[in-house]
From Swiss-Prot:
GO cellular component terms, A-Z: cytoplasm; ribonucleoprotein complex; ribosome
The protein, known as: Large ribosomal subunit protein bL21
InterPro entries for the chain: bL21-like, bL21-like_sf, Ribosomal_bL21, Ribosomal_bL21_CS
GO molecular function: rRNA binding; structural constituent of ribosome
Gene, per the UniProt record: rplU
Keywords in alphabetical order: Ribonucleoprotein, Ribosomal protein, RNA-binding, rRNA-binding
Amino acid sequence: MVYAIVKAGGRQEKVSVGDIVVVDRVGGEVGDTIELTPILLVDGDKVTNGKDLADVRVSAEIVRPEKGPKITILKFKNKTGYRKRQGHRQKLTRLKVTDIA
């Protein structure tokens, strides 16, 4: 089984061909192909890392942009009546790994 550890959206993800990964927002349109930065490649018993990864390419296709779950931020100060409520939804991108070469 071939898999790679790639850096995508500020995090490291373990991916193999056909996997769908959700990462922080990546620029591009739906259907575009992007290159992910490989950190480690495992092919059966053979492990590749460091300078040997210069030839390794991990390609992924942008499936769709989406948003994460809504979180609520509350601020409160005692005895003053100060209350502040704010929401946030992280922008994400769903990627499908198409090739590890």
